[in-house]
Amino acid sequence: MIRTEEMLLNVGPQHPSTHGVFRLVIKIDGEIIKEATPVIGYLHRGTEKIAESLQYTQIIPYTDRMDYLSAMTNNYVLCHAVETMMDLEIPERAEYLRVLAMELGRVASHLVWWGTNLLDIGAVSPFLYAFREREMIINLLSELCGARLTFNYMRVGGVKWDAPDGWIEKVKEFVPYMREQLEGYHDLVSGNEIFLNRVKGVGVYSAEEAISYSLSGANLRCTGVHWDLRKDEPYSIYDRFDFDVPVGSTGDAWDRYVCRMKEIEESLKIIEQAVEQFPKDGAVLAKVPKIIKAPKGEAFVRIESPRGEIGCYIASDGKKEPYRLKFRRPSFYNLQILPKLLKGENIANLITILGGVDIVLGEVDG
């Protein structure tokens, strides 16, 4: 008689494929995962509570450290919430700089995902190529704001600095270069039989399940749901750009891959149009007081980050600090479906599924 024995196995919190301090406790029977329990909180810093004792401008650097792979979108959602409460009109040049910064950040974020996800399942070369192109974007953003990762660039009313001389031309030159590299990425990976066997039909869920788990971003669109806040609830100046929203059909790891790769192409379209439409002159910061006091009341805004729908709720009592600040962090919500996806799966597919969800632990823990 064959007897099997279940075993508990810890993945993390210091495992290279969790990309941060994330612990996953799995119960396995042979090669099959019977149960998976995420353990989070190792990177919790109490950002929302700290914000209650900070001025609005002082909170911006804290947002950089949530989704540190896409800090510009975090900067923006906070500023956008305060601007909504103050009914501020943002200078046009500042809006274009914001869009350029956010879309460059989106491309850089997806490049990190592409390279590390493939490295985790055994492909080393794509990781090197992805970081080569990401370094070019980081250099562009560094020229713009002086930082490489935690940018602290946006302000309530606009941005801190104007683009330096020649910066727009460099961004313009980057777009065709990146498109050419994308073709190489697809030649290298997207048709590779070994890769396709690792991702097709793995980690499948339906549109109904995605919605019930509050998934967003590529994790939602891979099921065929056409939902992108840049298109469906345009903010900033996104209604001025012509771009598509990539969607999948089967909701597996392959569709999530395709959605993110196509999103890079769409971001390049937006960058190209923003460069062409970029105002020749103008202010980059609205006339706002040095110490900002949002009027009494509350506001909630949401935007599309590389990981999905990030929201910011502010309750103000008219002081220079928020009475209450709350972020809707997409990585936290996207993580919730992981136990369901892993149950009954072969342990060899664990890293493929985890990588496909694309979480950032600073955003999960807040």
Curated annotation (Swiss-Prot):
InterPro entries linked: NADH_Q_OxRdtase_suD (IPR001135), NDH1_su_D/H (IPR022885), NiFe-Hase_large (IPR029014)
Keywords, ordered alphabetically: Cell membrane, Membrane, NAD, Quinone, Translocase, Transport
Broadest EC class assigned to this enzyme: translocase
One Pfam family from the record: Complex1_49kDa
Record has Mitochondrion as a keyword: no
GO molecular function: NAD binding; NADH:ubiquinone reductase (non-electrogenic) activity; quinone binding
Reaction it catalyzes: a quinone + NADH + 5 H(+)(in) = a quinol + NAD(+) + 4 H(+)(out)
Domain of life of the source: Bacteria
A GO CC term attached to the entry: plasma membrane
Enzyme Commission code: 7.1.1.-
Keyword Cell membrane appears in the UniProt entry: yes
Membrane topology field: Peripheral membrane protein
Localization annotation: Cell membrane
Cited function: NDH-1 shuttles electrons from NADH, via FMN and iron-sulfur (Fe-S) centers, to quinones in the respiratory chain. The immediate electron acceptor for the enzyme in this species is believed to be a menaquinone. Couples the redox reaction to proton translocation (for every two electrons transferred, four hydrogen ions are translocated across the cytoplasmic membrane), and thus conserves the redox energy in a proton gradient.
Family note: Belongs to the complex I 49 kDa subunit family.
Quaternary structure and interacting proteins, as annotated: NDH-1 is composed of 14 different subunits. Subunits NuoB, C, D, E, F, and G constitute the peripheral sector of the complex.
Name the record gives this protein: NADH-quinone oxidoreductase subunit D
Encoding gene, per UniProt annotation: nuoD
